[in-house]
Design a protein with these regions (language model features):
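A short macromolecule-binding patch
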Residues: 125-130
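Anionic N-terminal interaction surfaces
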Residues: 2-72
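Phosphoinositide-binding peripheral membrane targeting modules
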Residues: 55-119, 124
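Hydrophobic, Leu/Ile/Phe/Ala-enriched alpha-helical segments that form helix-helix packing faces
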Residues: 25, 29-33, 106, 155-162
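Residue-level detector of intrinsically disordered, flexible termini
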Residues: 1, 42-43, 79, 104
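Terminal and domain-flanking low-complexity segments
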Residues: 3-6, 16, 132-162
């Protein structure tokens, strides 16, 4: 590798830190989801963009939320979504969505590449998965290329409604 290859290589992923995050994700998920050990896991995020218009001043503010997403195949494929924080110090209550009870589930390509699930007619879940994101203040620090691909395949083949 030449000098330019070393200069423009980009950040390296700390695999030990990533493995620690995966263990924390598993512990949190298993603590709040019944039979959590049966699920495969992927870290994800959700975003909420709000626009404002104050006369001459226009803009938007985006807030991000970290998620632990579990999925399991079987006779009734299920997705479980657990809200958490980027450092994985705690989590909220899970939203468990068996395929048989979901109103609609699809992958939205535009404006964001998100997996959208309508567990009922009142609200929806927007799940954005990633291989690795550098900003550990906003996102869970985890290297998860194979897990992301596995979730994408599961969603497309077993879970999506359209």
């Amino acid at each position: 590798m030449g000098i330019f290859g070393k200069l423009f290589k980009g950040p390296e992923i700390d695999q030990a830190k990533s493995a620690d995050s995966k263990q924390k994700m598993r512990r949190l998920f298993d603590s709040v989801v019944p039979d959590g050990e049966q699920y495969q896991l992927v870290a994800a995020y959700t975003e909420d963009a709000r626009r404002f218009n104050y006369g001459l001043v226009h803009g938007s503010k985006t807030t991000y939320g970290s998620l632990i997403v579990g999925w399991k195949e079987g006779t009734d494929p299920t997705v479980a979504v657990v809200p958490t924080v980027p450092d994985l110090s705690g989590c909220g209550d899970p939203e468990i969505c068996p395929r048989s009870t979901v109103k609609k589930a699809y992958r939205n390509k535009y404006p964001t590449d998100a997996f959208i699930i309508y567990p009922d007619g009142k609200h929806y879940l927007a799940i954005n998965t990633f291989e690795w994101l550098e900003d550990e203040k906003l996102f869970i620090y985890v290297d998860q290329g194979p897990e992301q691909q596995a979730f994408e395949t599961f969603f497309k083949t077993c879970y999506a409604t359209k």
